[in-house]
Curated annotation (Swiss-Prot):
Domain of life assignment: Eukaryota
Protein's organism: Mus musculus (Mouse)
Gene Ontology BP, a term: chromosome organization
InterPro entries for the chain: CENP-W, CENP-W/WIP1, Histone-fold
Subcellular location: Nucleus; Chromosome, Centromere; Chromosome, Centromere, Kinetochore; Nucleus matrix
Pfam families: CENP-W (PF15510)
GO CC annotations, alphabetized: chromosome, centromeric region; inner kinetochore; kinetochore; nuclear matrix; nucleolus; nucleoplasm; nucleus
Gene3D superfamilies referenced in this protein's UniProt entry, alphabetically: Histone, subunit A
Entry similarity comment: Belongs to the CENP-W/WIP1 family.
Entry protein name: Centromere protein W
GO MF terms held by the record: DNA binding; protein heterodimerization activity
């Protein structure tokens, strides 16, 4: 068998822990946060962005557009935020 032409890459970039901790302490100094809460917040942001990209891609395909436009992202954001509220 011939080797695959696509090479999978491992993501080596780490979460911006110092930035997240500093921002959280500036915005919400009264919160007592655990050790790994910054990693959980970073993961939550990444999952949100992934859902936003998938939903906006779906919106673009439904409108028969090859390019994801601002309107697609805004509509997807409304849907995702509504779903996350419960």
């Amino acid at each position: 068998m011939a080797p695959s032409t696509t090479v999978t890459r491992r993501v080596k970039r780490k979460a911006p822990r110092a930035f997240l901790k500093r921002t959280l302490k500036q915005k919400k100094p009264h919160l007592g946060l655990g050790r790994c809460c910054d990693l959980l917040i970073h993961l939550n942001c990444l999952l949100f962005i992934q859902r936003l990209a998938e939903e906006s891609r779906t919106n673009a395909c439904e409108s028969k557009s090859r390019v994801i436009k601002k309107d697609h992202v805004l509509a997807a954001g409304k849907v995702i935020l509504k779903k996350s509220r419960g």
